[in-house]
Amino acid sequence: MEYSHVVYALLAVALAIIFVLKGGKPSLKPTKYQALLEGYLRFVRNMLLENVGERGLKYVPLIAAIGLFVFFGNILGMVPGFEAPTANINTNLALALLVFFYYHFEGFRENGLAYLKHFMGPIPLMAPFFFVVEVISHIARPITLSLRLFANMKAGALLLLTLVSLVIKNPFTLVVSPVVLIFVIAIKFLAIFIQTYIFMILSVVYIAGAVAHEEH
C-alpha cells in the first residue's frame, strides 16, 4: 500500500495513547503501566532539567509524546507482517520538521528578534559568514535527524527479513538460525531504544539551544 506508513503511524499513535491512558488511570494499587509511565516521565523530566533547566519542564509533554511515538513506531517493525512507520523517510521527516519549526518558534518566543544573534557568531565582522553557515547547519538538522532513524530502522527490518527468508529457503539453517535470530532480535531491540533516545535527546538539545538567552 502506497500510504501504509500513514496507517502504521496512526497505529503507533493509538498504542501510545493506550499506554498513557492505562498508565494514567487512578489506582489504589500502582500497576505496571503506572510504574512504567511514571518512570518514563521522570526520565524525560531529568533530561530536560539537565539540558534546559527548570523552564524546560514545560516541554515534558512534547518530548514524552515524541519518544512514545518513535518507540511504538519502531516496535511495530518487530511484529510479523507489520511495517515500522519509522522505517519510512516521510514519517521521520514530518516528525523532524515538527521539531525544527517548534524550536525556532520557541527561540523567537523566548528571545524575540534577539534570537537571530544565535546565527551571527561571536565576531561581528564575520557575522554574514556565520549566518550562512548556521542557516545551512539548521536546515541540515531535520534531514540528518530523519535519515538517521530511517537508516537504522530500515536496515534492521531488512536484516530480519533476510534471516527469515534464509530459514524458509534452506531448512538446514534451522540448526543455527534460532541462536542467530535471538541475537539479531536482541540487537534490534537495543537499536529501538537507542534510536528513540537519540531522537529525543537531539530534540531537547535543539530546543535548549534555541531558548538559551544571549549573555550581555
From Swiss-Prot:
SUPFAM superfamilies: F1F0 ATP synthase subunit A. PROSITE patterns: ATPASE_A. One of its GO terms (cellular component) is proton-transporting ATP synthase complex. Its main location: membrane. It comes from the Bacteria. The chain crosses the membrane at residues 1-21, 62-82, 88-108, 119-139, 149-169, 174-194, 196-216. Keywords: ATP synthesis, Cell inner membrane, Cell membrane, CF(0), Hydrogen ion transport, Ion transport, Membrane, Transmembrane, Transmembrane helix, Transport. InterPro entries: ATP_syn_F0_a_bact/chloroplast (IPR045082), ATP_synth_F0_asu (IPR000568), ATP_synth_F0_asu_AS (IPR023011), F0_ATP_A_sf (IPR035908). Pfam families: ATP-synt_A. Belongs to the ATPase A chain family. Key component of the proton channel; it plays a direct role in the translocation of protons across the membrane. This is ATP synthase subunit a. It comes from Aquifex aeolicus (strain VF5).
